[in-house]
Amino acid sequence: VENSTYLSEYGATFPTRIYSYQDSGGDYSVTVVDYTESRRIHSERDRTEADYELYWEVDVRASIAFAAWNLRRRGGEITYDAYHYIDRVEGHQLQITNEDQSRTYAAIYLHDSHLYIAEATVPSGSLPPGFFQQSLEFIDRDGGRIRYRNYSDAIKVRDAQVR
């Protein structure tokens, strides 16, 4: 586990925690960017005339797209690039064949002002890291599984019966 920082699309720096594991089967990580103080962090940074008061919110809402863009620009052949969700927490998945023929499987989700970037890079010829990708779920402070009954454009209602 490593504490770090993450530079957002709009130039703000956010606290980040990176959980990682490496072995001969690949490199695995989950990066969690904490956007809970976005309004304060944006208000305290140096501004230009081009800055807009609500960029703190736009920075959070656009964080999935920005993280996906950062993964795409690393290079390699993108073989999968699509919207995804876990328990109706919206996100995005990418699969990339890297220059060395290793494969990167990435999933990005935004929940409760936290951006989750899960990445697994496995050597050429390895099986896809399906368990790693499919084991991610969101839990509340009491350890209960979170599943929503509707999407973000509607009022979110928590489905209390899923545990």
Mark where each language-model region is.
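Signature of long, low-cysteine stretches enriched in small and polar/charged residues
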Residues: V1-R39, E44-Y109
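Surface-exposed amphipathic alpha-helical segments
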Residues: V1, E53, E57, R61-R72, ...
